[in-house]
Amino acid sequence: MEQQRKLFQQRGYSEDLLPKTQSQRTWKTFNYFTLWMGSVHNVPNYVMVGGFFILGLSTFSIMLAIILSAFFIAAVMVLNGAAGSKYGVPFAMILRASYGVRGALFPGLLRGGIAAIMWFGLQCYAGSLACLILIGKIWPGFLTLGGDFTLLGLSLPGLITFLIFWLVNVGIGFGGGKVLNKFTAILNPCIYIVFGGMAIWAISLVGIGPIFDYIPSGIQKAENGGFLFLVVINAVVAVWAAPAVSASDFTQNAHSFREQALGQTLGLVVAYILFAVAGVCIIAGASIHYGADTWNVLDIVQRWDSLFASFFAVLVILMTTISTNATGNIIPAGYQIAAIAPTKLTYKNGVLIASIISLLICPWKLMENQDSIYLFLDIIGGMLGPVIGVMMAHYFVVMRGQINLDELYTAPGDYKYYDNGFNLTAFSVTLVAVILSLGGKFIHFMEPLSRVSWFVGVIVAFAAYALLKKRTTAEKTGEQKTIG
């Protein structure tokens, strides 16, 4: 391993992109158990639970669908992170195995560039709004600071809270996995206290019976419950399309495959059991108690009389936003941008570039057209499902769990593998799978497929790529020399 690392360094690769040595792989089961809790318990996910009630499904059906989703998520996170835990290599380099040295840049930029940076900015802005609530409860005069002053549409209090929250997120990004580990270890028990406590509060207010009988006003019980049950599972799993595709950014630190597999599985299942119970109890209970559909946990917290309870709850919600932003956005963006110019950029350079771009796009302006921006990001997310399918088919079916690292860490300008550095089979399969999974957003008769787009994209891409690559034994590169 040391000889390989020295060779790759001579080719110009930065330390951040090199395969981790065994001594550098320090993450154990507990680290992975705590990793994703904040990404499960965040404001958008709780709002999503409210949307599930609109489908007309029962409370129990929604809870069961959410819990079952955890097993699909865990399976994909573990399996797509297998190469990372085996070889200690980040996503940006693993992607080269299936798409080619040059071809990997396109799906990599979709995930680590466009989607991650835009979501990072949007999450920073959303978090700053919660921060504004928090400061406003302690210091009401802060909300009128600066009078009518605005900068690019932001008031002075809004600008201050955004920059503070942005800087905290950037700091976590610079710290990488080591800082994130310490942060999530503190966050996890706080999540149990806040969201578990909110669930108990909701049950004590209205009782468990009314919660299980809750249906939003004007909504009829669903007739095609089986398909809608699958739609709920797809919606929950699809949220993880981006983190799952770049799972190796975290599994590269694993002490062993078993540690990351056990830790992620237990962590995600436990997190989603709590989320399923707390989510439906909080949303249904609050809606019944206040006499109106109330699906945003921040709106619920704002109604509380206790300043301490509100302060602590909003603080934890802010922490979950930071955790989500780190695991899902800024850390993958840092690695991916570094991979664009591996001889010139480091991970921290990537974090800095991504952070600055997230400021320049003015996320508060993007939020003025929420429907358009979320549709755009949803389409990008829909493209990542097929990428997962291709990556897993290549690693497990075509290469049978083996990767030739020397062919991933090629010298600059060396594109002898695949067609000038592009795996055209991977791109063709990805395109077909994307059309099938997202076509329903634009073509009416394909609409049912788009409602289960993540499953369609992953399954079609996995099956098609595995079949095509198995049959194509005499490609230009030849299967014996295929990257991976």
Q: Predicted regions: what is each one?
A:
Residues 1-59, 71, 196, 205-209, ...:
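Membrane-interface "cap" regions at the ends of multi-pass membrane proteins
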Residues 19, 23, 387-464, 471, ...:
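C-terminal membrane-solvent junction of multi-pass transporters and transport-like membrane proteins
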Residues 27-46, 161-168, 199-206, 217-280, ...:
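Hydrophobic, membrane-embedded alpha-helices of multi-pass small-molecule transporters
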Residues 41-45, 68-76, 111-123, 189-204, ...:
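Selective recognition of specific alpha-helical transmembrane segments in multi-pass small-molecule
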Residues 66-99, 111-125, 282-286, 322-323, ...:
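Juxtamembrane transmembrane-helix boundary signature
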Residues 108-109, 135-175, 189-198, 228-247, ...:
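Transmembrane alpha-helical segments of multi-pass small-molecule transport proteins
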Residues 124, 128-137, 190-218, 239-240, ...:
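Hydrophobic alpha-helical segments and their helix-loop junctions in multi-pass secondary transporters
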Residues 125-128, 160-204, 264-268, 376-385:
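Membrane-interface loop-to-helix entry segments
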